[in-house]
Regions:
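DNA- and nucleic-acid-binding/regulatory domain cores of transcription factors and nucleic-acid enzymes
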Residues: 1, 76-78, 150, 154
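Electropositive nucleic-acid engagement tracts
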Residues: 1-52
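Structured beta-strand/turn binding interfaces of compact recognition modules in eukaryotic regulators
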Residues: 12, 23, 46-49, 65, ...
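Extended amphipathic alpha-helical interaction segments
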Residues: 101-177
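Electropositive, glycine- and tryptophan-enriched low-complexity nucleic-acid-binding patches
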Residues: 30-108
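Compositionally biased, intrinsically disordered/low-complexity regions enriched for serine, proline
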Residues: 15, 76-78, 128, 170
């Protein structure tokens, strides 16, 4: 069986949905160049974005600091390795991050910043396999989680939610971007 060069790993255990890791050599080279640069490192971010039937998709993204957008001057966001998996647990994320840590083991982890939402298993595996990297959380996810807790779990009225929210982020909790 010949595999496409973008499909780098397919594996399954017991009665679990198979895991698939997708990336190419260019993505790994660029992550090494842009996410480990001491002077202008890009954050390598991961987010379990959506569910396709029984499969979750966890893409990674980074900024290509060698390119600037003409209209804004910002660096464009590029897609990094993608992880397809059936469970969002430490076993699955551990396989993914151990694989990535082997690919990046010749890099200085202390220069690396990893970003994610606050999903526990994802965060634990990032910390376990990249122990010297800086872990940062996505503000948008934190804001949404706080809004949801204040509104749905605690049941605070909009006025109190706005007051608390504004004290932390200087904006209203019902504003999504």
């Amino acid at each position: 069986m010949t595999m496409d060069s973008f499909i780098r790993f397919v594996g399954a255990s017991q009665s679990r949905v198979p895991n698939v890791m997708l990336y190419d050599d260019r993505q790994i080279r660029e992550i090494k160049a842009f996410c480990f640069a001491a002077d202008s490192a890009s954050v390598l971010s991961f987010d379990k974005t959506f569910n396709l039937e029984s499969i979750y998709v966890t893409p990674s993204v980074y900024k290509n600091t060698a390119v600037n957008r003409k209209c804004t001057g910002d660096h464009p966001v590029f897609l990094g390795p993608i992880f397809l998996h059936g469970h969002s647990d430490r076993l699955n994320y551990g396989m993914f991050f151990s694989h990535l840590s082997l690919l990046l083991m010749d890099c200085n982890q202390q220069a690396l910043m990893l970003g994610s939402d606050d999903e526990t298993a994802l965060h634990q595996c990032m910390q376990a396999f990249f122990p010297r990297a800086a872990l940062i959380s996505c503000t948008r996810h934190l804001q949404e989680n706080v809004r949801q807790q204040l509104e749905e779990r605690i049941g605070l009225c909009l006025e109190l939610r706005c007051s608390l929210y504004n004290g932390v982020w200087r904006r209203r909790p019902d504003v999504t971007h």
